From Swiss-Prot:
One of its GO terms (cellular component) is plasma membrane. This is UPF0154 protein LCA_1273. Belongs to the UPF0154 family. The chain crosses the membrane at residues 3-23. Keywords: Cell membrane, Membrane, Transmembrane, Transmembrane helix. It is a single-pass membrane protein. Residues 55-76 are annotated as: Disordered. Pfam families: UPF0154 (PF03672).
């Protein structure tokens, strides 16, 4: 009887911990992406205009592909 109650308490605790961890991680990621949004083409276009460059479609595509390639290399 005591072993069964111990196992039940352990299972309930593990489930509660998993649910709390999921929602905690979800809230953290939402906050992180609000503070640090991923770079998109519109942001690159604005940065290029601020630097005095004319943002052509070719340049934007080159910059986006180089950023994606750099992200892939850094993940390895």
């Amino acid at each position: 009887m005591n072993i069964g109650i111990g196992v039940l308490i352990f299972v309930i605790g593990a489930l509660l911990g998993a649910v709390a961890g999921f929602f905690g991680a979800r809230a953290y990621m939402k906050k992180y992406f609000e503070e640090n949004p991923p770079v998109n083409e519109d942001m690159l276009k604005a940065m290029m205009m601020q630097m005095g460059q004319k943002p052509s479609e070719k340049k934007l595509n080159q910059m986006m592909s180089s950023m994606k390639a750099q992200q892939k290399r850094s993940k390895k």
